[in-house]
Amino acid sequence: GRGLTQCRSEGPGEIHFITHSLGGILLRYYLSENTISELGRVVMLGPPNQGSEIVDGLLTLPGFGFIGGPAGVALGTGEGSIINSLGPVEFDLGIIAGSTNINPLEFLFITGPSDSIVSIESTKVRGMNAHMVLPVTHTFMMRNNEVIEQAIHYLKTGSFILESIDEEVDD
């Protein structure tokens, strides 16, 4: 509401978004229910676009449903997950995933390389225009100079700076 109103008051033009983690899911949910006619490009940093494998692991612990509540349970990777009910994106989206793990217990919950919180695979979503992997952690990726440079470049051009794209993405 207020943020969009303020953007619109700045004058005509596109409204771009950079989100981090669950912020990307909130934007996807908002756009599934609303239209932003001035929507430009979106860059998501470490979004759990296919749900959270950590939530799946925590669901097995007694009391998680009570502590995490229905919202916590709905963030998993299962069929009942709100995240997985959102479907493909229909806007210009670039995603940056991290590949640096500093979580010694990650192996208990996450399959494959991750940023310590979200697996690289889980960041992907059907309809995305670009995906890249950088050697950053989930918690601090938004403060990383290369992430910032890549995000700004994507908002301006609709593509990431190709020299930095991880080879995993080219498969």
Regions found by a protein language model. Give the residues of each.
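Serine-dependent carboxylesterase/thioesterase catalytic core
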Residues: 1-90, 107-110
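C-terminal catalytic-base region of ester-bond hydrolases, centering on the histidine
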Residues: 88-171
